[in-house]
A protein has these predicted regions:
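Amphipathic, Lys/Arg-enriched alpha-helical "gate/interface" segment within cytosolic domains
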Residues: 1-158
Length: 158
């Protein structure tokens, strides 16, 4: 079985404050962490690696319902990815109602030449369609995993 054939149903991490799912060639992370620390970031990355089997996938969805990583934690995450031999996702998306966060992802995509697009929470179905273009995963599967992740975290996806 190749890594892209793997499906990991939404699984809780960080004592129920975060979820991870892998749908073939798309990963999904949803977190409701009120305050990230470097230790939590590393625990999250290691937990995702253990559950996901250490496979780099070409597309990734991130949803931060609580606080998102700060600049130092994004750097820590990037360095951890490189040090552990993973390839960064070629297509990334984030759901946030913050214009600042969405604008930051746009700027990031320009600087890194990464295919990246941010969506408002109300546009989560459009995000599912966008992230799976030319992928094995389907928009229906990504949306279902997103909905289950929200439920596991005690949230409702509207």
């Amino acid at each position: 079985m190749t890594g892209f054939q793997k499906v990991v149903k939404p699984t809780l991490l960080l004592n129920g404050k975060a979820c991870f799912a892998q749908l073939h060639d798309v990963t999904l992370i949803v977190s409701d962490v009120p305050k990230w620390t470097n230790e939590l970031v590393l625990e999250y990355l290691n937990g995702m690696t253990k559950i996901g089997g250490g496979v780099s996938v070409p597309a990734s969805v991130a949803v931060f319902l609580g606080e998102s990583f700060d600049a130092g934690q994004r750097k820590l995450s990037t360095e951890w990815i490189e040090e552990n031999g993973f390839q960064p996702a070629k297509r990334i998306t984030m759901i946030s109602d913050s214009l600042l966060i969405r604008g930051s992802l746009t700027a990031y995509s320009w600087l890194t030449k990464t295919e990246a697009k941010a969506f408002a929470m109300k546009d989560h179905k459009a995000m599912c369609d966008w992230i799976v273009r030319e992928r094995i995963a389907t928009a229906t599967d990504v949306h279902e995993a997103l909905s289950i992740s929200f439920h596991l975290l005690g949230k409702k996806l509207l």
